Amino acid sequence: MSTGGQAQIGNVDLVKQLNGAAVYRLIDQQGPISRIQIAELSQLAPASVTKITRQLLERGLIKEVDQQASTGGRRAISIVSETRHFHTVAVRLGRHDATITLYDMSGKSLGEEHYPLPERTQETLENALFIAIAQFIENYQRKLRELIAIAVILPGLVDPALGVVRYMPHISVNNWALVDNLKQRFNVTSFVGHDIRSLALAEHYFGATRDCEDSILVRLHRGTGAGIIVNGQIFLGNNGNVGEIGHIQIDPLGERCHCGNFGCLETVAANAAIEHRVRQLLTQGYPSKLTLDDCSISAICKAANRGDLLASEVIEHVGRYLGKAVAIAINLFNPQKVVIAGEITEAEKVLLPAIQSCINTQVLKDFRKNLPVVTSELNHRSAIGAFALAKRAMLNGVLLQRLLES
């Protein structure tokens, strides 16, 4: 009997969370909006909408605003979300450093700092990371109204449901319970996610894919990875890790990849691989304005934009191989838009046509029809993916319900 009662209580809590999320989502994404409009769009009873909006108002999560009636008569009362008073500490943990940014709930950055983290063990990295977060919070104490979440994104394999880091490319981790440890240290709701998957979600909320529900983001940096959005949600699969596009084999006779295979996309389309190819060609005597002392990815992109033949050839070469992998992904997922992210997009006028050429010849006609291939709008906001995890938790009701109950 007790089991049935507990299940019933659980179901009631879930319904409360889902209904609250439905109302908050409409206010956040379509506000100013009236209670009548919320009831119509959510298909909730007007009494339920009134109750939920009262709770949100009392908690300070929404506010009422006057809107001029279309008839010119009495002003109608509408509702918008209150974004200024609730803050998230968003962390992008890299291989050697951390970028920490303070966001309000609109996605506005209130401050950002960079911290070197050269540690090489799980324990020392966690200790240094937590010291950096504590220092950051102390530095921004005057701007902080209410800290509602800490979110961390990182490269590697992550179990977002359990909040556990399974693998990182540069240090050995053993089921690193990062979320539980953050909660214990800072006493605030915490999240962890994969950096590129989270960036794809951020692009959906704030960037180039706001206007579509299905998209693919491919980012080139130290490695090459993808984030896939399906029906407005990150596609994660059973264990939370999907999108290793960098390990699609595009050249069976190619270089050996760190994963152990040969000819992975990452051996061609990652910053280090691009820089290495340019150095090889320069050493072989190919003419270019680039020099061995200055052939960073940024310098290569600038040279390509200026028409440097060697730089342009290298970027086009990357684009063709990247295009092959992107074409495979398009045929699998049929997205509404493809986004390319990373420093290489500085040479988008050279890169994108090479990718598009592959799409035109290797993707089903119906799938490539009216399919935009664009560059990321969030390239210079490295921690925005972490904030997207907190935003999602507000929109799906998980974090929202905790705030209403606190």
PLM features per residue range, with description:
Residues 1-67, 71-146, 253, 265-406:
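ATP-binding/phosphotransfer module of carbohydrate and carboxylate kinases, centering on a glycine-rich
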Residues 96-98, 157-159, 225:
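Short, acidic Gly/Pro/Ser/Thr-rich loop/turn segments
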Residues 104, 160, 229:
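Short, acidic, Ser/Thr-enriched surface-loop or helix-capping motifs
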Residues 109-214, 350-361:
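Glycine-rich phosphate-binding loop and adjoining helix at the ATP-binding site
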Residues 112-114, 120-125, 174, 181-309:
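Glycine/GP-enriched mid-protein hinge/lid loop-to-helix segment characteristic of carbohydrate kinases
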Residues 155-158, 222-223, 344:
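Short glycine-rich anion-binding loops that position phosphate/pyrophosphate groups of nucleotides
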